[in-house]
């Protein structure tokens, strides 16, 4: 089981890095609020996702992400990559505690790839 989890963790990292380099020309994605005084829709979603994850509601956070995501706006891709990279940094014990297996993170990353038309990057 440990090897499978480790393999999934590396797959998530690799997919995130490939998308980051291809789309944003940087190896690490960290979403940054565009305007603290007048937050954008992605800024508000980012804050909401962070609060949900902090309260252990990871599944609800992922649902909110996909409810609001706009595949025509690269800011949503940046936000989603940041979201999944943060989840991937959680320990297996934390993910298990919140009933969110690491495989779901990989599934979410693969859904992003499809939504944003990036399948050719991740073959």
Regions found by a protein language model. Name each.
Residues 1-73, 89-123:
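N-terminal alpha-helical interaction modules that lie
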Residues 76-80:
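Short, well-ordered alpha-helical segments
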Residues 67, 82-83:
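Short acidic/histidine-centered micro-motifs embedded in hydrophobic/aromatic stretches
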């Amino acid at each position: 089981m440990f090897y499978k989890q480790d393999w999934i963790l590396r797959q998530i990292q690799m997919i995130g890095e490939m998308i980051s380099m291809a789309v944003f020309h940087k190896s690490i994605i960290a979403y940054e609020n565009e305007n603290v005084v007048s937050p954008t829709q992605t800024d508000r979603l980012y804050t909401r996702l962070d609060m949900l994850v902090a309260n252990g509601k990871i599944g609800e956070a992922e649902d909110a992400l996909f409810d609001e995501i706009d595949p025509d706006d690269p800011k949503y891709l940046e936000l989603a990559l940041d979201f999944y990279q943060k989840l991937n940094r959680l320990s297996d014990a934390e993910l298990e505690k919140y009933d969110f297996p690491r495989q779901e993170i990989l599934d979410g990353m693969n859904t992003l790839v499809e939504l944003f038309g990036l399948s050719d990057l991740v073959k």
